[in-house]
Amino acid sequence: EPYKEDWKVVPVDGFGTQEQIRSILRSERPDILWFMTDPRFFSWLWEIENEVRPLLPMVYYHVWDNFPAPMFNRKFYLSNDVMVSISKLTDEVIKEVAPEVERHHIPHAVMNNVFRPLPEESRQKIREDSLPEEDRDKTVFFWNNRNARRKQSGTLIFWFKEFLDKHDLHDKCQLIMHTDPNDPHGQPLQHLIEKLGLGARQVLLSTQKISPENLAAVYNMADCTINISDAEGFGLATLESLSCGTPIIVNMTGGLQEQVQKNGKEFGIPIFPSSKAVIGSQQVPYIYEDRINKEHFISALNKMYQMGPNFSNFQESWANLMLSVHERHGSWDTRKGYNNIRFLEVA
């Protein structure tokens, strides 16, 4: 291993305990305590900040799904020396909740040597090796998420079925879902597939853990990656997909917003929420839940299907057409082929 003795792994249940932290501080004498994810998992750690911070700084890599700004997190934010945001939305949240805390923005990233676009012949070879002959010419939609309520896994299957019905595409499109179909926090996906009559390979389940290299191959094989979560801090799967050159369909919520649109360009199809609800729990008293509607999603699926197997080809086709139109028809001083005078026979 490249890090050798500089990298140590300590097994823990959950996210650790106060005693484990105290022991590691005494035995290893680290220079920085770095931790990340949802603040709900680290209240126990902030409880001993007065023991930790006199010795070394606490750096928290944070993501938050949505507004309103969670003022109930202020006590947690103030318990860090430095906060680093994963998404631009999170950066705005930290700024509003605890502006006095040192703040930086470092977005998620992927390994570009793994998640990268492959030549078209390589993509076709992956399809030939991974799919039976009857599936190779289908438009393949990919979904890579946890099977949980906010990820809208069941909604996706129901709406995908309606999309197939509406446009008569049962033998033209396929949805591959890489997830645990029996996750206790989600829906029984195999049951939904059977109930809706999607057992003829319209919806496939990928349930085994796979290497990053094989996952990148699936992104390259797919025509589009979907994420319609009603709350999403960032959305790593869609970032991996874009890194492989595969466009995305996403709900414009959380960190997904900054992935699909940037500098005036779109890297897929954004779907704007049609409704907002304020939900909450005992630990998270309030947060917006962004929901898209069925019609907008089915329209996005059909638009992606009409684009054909390669979004880049779609963009290139438009660029070539516009250049051709300009060459043949001109503009301003070079305008040709148009005459606004028409002669009509008058009785």
Show the residue positions of the predicted features.
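Short N-terminal targeting/anchoring amphipathic segment
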Residues: 22-42, 57-60
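Acidic anion/phosphate-binding donor-loop and adjacent secondary structure
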Residues: 70-72, 95, 110-132, 187
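Carbohydrate-associated surface elements
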Residues: 89, 109
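Conserved donor-binding/catalytic core segment of Leloir-type glycosyltransferases
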Residues: 133-151, 157-160, 175-176
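Nucleotide-activated donor-binding/catalytic signature segment of Leloir-type glycosyltransferases, i.e.
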Residues: 186-209, 213
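Aromatic "clamp/platform" in nucleotide-sugar-dependent glycosyltransferases that forms part
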Residues: 230
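Short hydrophobic beta-strand element within catalytic cores of glycosyltransferases
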Residues: 247-250, 260-261, 267-270
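A charged, aromatic-enriched C-terminal amphipathic alpha-helix characteristic of glycosyltransferases
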Residues: 289-296, 306-343
